[in-house]
């Protein structure tokens, strides 16, 4: 019997917890999924430096194809860590690997990390109880937009809820907040249900957890013409029915 750990690295080195670092240093093999989410200062090199161990880079897709290899390491008595930027089980789900390891008699542990989801809610000062389903704006495929984000925001609006909007991340490019809003405006133009209007508020986070992070509240029309810093970015589309304290909180971000 061996241990497999799913380790949250947080958003940057200053959010890497002692618990996570202790587990990484005590593991025999470390796979690092540092591609599904981006950090300003956590990469293979920094992980090698802080753990003193070799790091095996792996995307989520690579981990899925290497499940048998990981199980083989566990079966041989090696303790394995899967290190993930942010939190290991919120945005990037490795449940299949965890349940497979447990079925083979190995111990499974999750070491949570500071996730972009929780961080952005806290920085926005919006009520955490009023968040509905989250959604991702993706790059068009063969010039076709996926209208799921528009539908999710519409449903959340009808329920008086906020929407956390993640932005697509691919090897070919990282989506920025202004591009995502342009896609949402295109969806609005195509569907016309008045879900994304120029005067609607959005909260935009840039490089969360990093020294140069910014979180700002602004109208959609202003965001479309805004020059944002380097990614990663994330967007909250607030409910149109804000509590008085939420309104006051958003003033701190303008």
Swiss-Prot record:
<feature type="binding site">
    <location>
        <position position="11"/>
    </location>
    <ligand>
        <name>S-adenosyl-L-methionine</name>
    </ligand>
</feature>
<protein>
    <recommendedName>
        <fullName>Diphthine synthase</fullName>
        <ecNumber>2.1.1.98</ecNumber>
    </recommendedName>
</protein>
<feature type="binding site">
    <location>
        <position position="233"/>
    </location>
    <ligand>
        <name>S-adenosyl-L-methionine</name>
    </ligand>
</feature>
<feature type="binding site">
    <location>
        <begin position="115"/>
        <end position="116"/>
    </location>
    <ligand>
        <name>S-adenosyl-L-methionine</name>
    </ligand>
</feature>
<keyword id="KW-0489">Methyltransferase</keyword>
<keyword id="KW-0949">S-adenosyl-L-methionine</keyword>
<dbReference type="GO" id="GO:0032259">
    <property type="term" value="P:methylation"/>
</dbReference>
<dbReference type="InterPro" id="IPR004551">
    <property type="entry name" value="Dphthn_synthase"/>
</dbReference>
<comment type="similarity">
    <text>Belongs to the diphthine synthase family.</text>
</comment>
<feature type="binding site">
    <location>
        <position position="87"/>
    </location>
    <ligand>
        <name>S-adenosyl-L-methionine</name>
    </ligand>
</feature>
<feature type="binding site">
    <location>
        <position position="167"/>
    </location>
    <ligand>
        <name>S-adenosyl-L-methionine</name>
    </ligand>
</feature>
<comment type="pathway">
    <text>Protein modification; peptidyl-diphthamide biosynthesis.</text>
</comment>
<dbReference type="GO" id="GO:0017183">
    <property type="term" value="P:protein histidyl modification to diphthamide"/>
</dbReference>
<dbReference type="InterPro" id="IPR014776">
    <property type="entry name" value="4pyrrole_Mease_sub2"/>
</dbReference>
<feature type="binding site">
    <location>
        <position position="90"/>
    </location>
    <ligand>
        <name>S-adenosyl-L-methionine</name>
    </ligand>
</feature>
<dbReference type="Pfam" id="PF00590">
    <property type="entry name" value="TP_methylase"/>
</dbReference>
<dbReference type="InterPro" id="IPR000878">
    <property type="entry name" value="4pyrrol_Mease"/>
</dbReference>
<comment type="function">
    <text>S-adenosyl-L-methionine-dependent methyltransferase that catalyzes the trimethylation of the amino group of the modified target histidine residue in translation elongation factor 2 (EF-2), to form an intermediate called diphthine. The three successive methylation reactions represent the second step of diphthamide biosynthesis.</text>
</comment>
<dbReference type="GO" id="GO:0004164">
    <property type="term" value="F:diphthine synthase activity"/>
</dbReference>
<dbReference type="InterPro" id="IPR014777">
    <property type="entry name" value="4pyrrole_Mease_sub1"/>
</dbReference>
<dbReference type="InterPro" id="IPR035996">
    <property type="entry name" value="4pyrrol_Methylase_sf"/>
</dbReference>
<comment type="subunit">
    <text>Homodimer.</text>
</comment>
<keyword id="KW-0808">Transferase</keyword>
<feature type="binding site">
    <location>
        <position position="208"/>
    </location>
    <ligand>
        <name>S-adenosyl-L-methionine</name>
    </ligand>
</feature>
